[in-house]
């Protein structure tokens, strides 16, 4: 097993949605070691082509806003288990 853990990044604020927070969160993600990050995000126009270009997995929920619901919590836990994540980051505190 690698000495580098894997982190699940949960966020509403991720490109291709425009904005400064979105760019900041993306920059955090792309600067992580290869294989160490998985992103769970909401959808935005152009997400499929954007995600295909990323050097890490991006899992999109079928919504434009992730809300702190039991279903989202279950899905995040499922993704963390499936990808062997040992840490979770939240891209922005609200609304998650």
Where are these predicted regions, by residue range?
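Extreme N-terminal starter segment of soluble prokaryotic enzymes
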Residues: 2-7
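N-terminal strand-loop element at the rim of the active site
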Residues: 11-18, 24-68
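Short, well-structured alpha-helical segments in soluble
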Residues: 74-84
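Short His-centered aromatic/hydrophobic patch
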Residues: 90-96
């Amino acid at each position: 097993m690698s000495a580098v853990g894997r982190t699940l990044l949960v966020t509403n604020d991720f490109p291709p949605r425009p904005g400064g927070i979105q760019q900041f969160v993306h920059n955090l993600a792309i600067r992580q070691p290869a294989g160490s990050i998985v992103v769970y995000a909401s959808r935005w126009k152009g997400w499929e082509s954007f995600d295909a270009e990323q050097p890490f997995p991006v899992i999109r929920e079928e919504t434009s806003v992730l809300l702190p619901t039991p279903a989202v919590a279950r899905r995040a836990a499922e993704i963390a288990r499936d990808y062997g994540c040992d840490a979770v980051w939240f891209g922005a505190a609200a609304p998650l």
